[in-house]
């Protein structure tokens, strides 16, 4: 019955029923008897569950890594770094001074090798410079 390139139109009865459907719904919507289709709460529940999962992950990470984040690990050298002033003294031998090493009680001794007398007197030794 159908020929190539020829399409039959729907019958007027079918066509008229589809045209009248929106007109029939319009008075129901205006009168308030028309109900909106029910929407399930799946998107809202999904968002709430996702927020709680992210919160749980944050709490687990904070509890697991928290103590390590608050502790600073600093490695201090046992000796101070060697100062390198231009034309100055390089202090490379450090030792802890005791009560017998106080500068007031230090006996006058020979000059440190390599020290030359300055115009205002002998230069202090490395031990004396360290005490200062």
From Swiss-Prot:
Glycan-linked positions: 15
Major subcellular location class: membrane
| Membrane topology term | Single-pass membrane protein
Task: Report the GO terms under cellular component.
Answer: membrane
Sorted keywords for this record are: Glycoprotein, Membrane, Transmembrane, Transmembrane helix
Query: Which stretches of sequence are listed as region Disordered?
Result: 1-28, 99-132
InterPro entries listed in its UniProt record: SMIM33
Intracellular or extracellular location(s): Membrane
Transmembrane segment boundaries: 43-63
Keyword Glycoprotein in the entry? The reply is yes
- Supply the name of the protein: Small integral membrane protein 33
């Amino acid at each position: 019955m159908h020929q190539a390139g020829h399409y039959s139109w729907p019958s007027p009865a079918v066509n008229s029923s589809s045209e009248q459907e929106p007109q029939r719904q319009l008075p129901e919507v205006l009168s308030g008897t028309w109900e909106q289709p029910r929407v399930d709460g799946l998107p809202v529940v999904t968002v709430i569950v996702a927020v709680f999962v992210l919160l749980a992950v944050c709490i687990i990470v904070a509890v697991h890594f928290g103590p390590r984040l608050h502790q600073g690990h600093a490695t201090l050298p046992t000796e101070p770094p060697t100062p390198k002033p231009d034309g100055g003294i390089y202090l490379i031998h450090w030792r802890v001074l005791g009560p017998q090493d106080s500068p007031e009680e230090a006996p006058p001794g020979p000059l440190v090798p390599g020290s030359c007398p300055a115009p205002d007197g002998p230069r202090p030794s490395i031990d004396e410079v360290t005490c200062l």
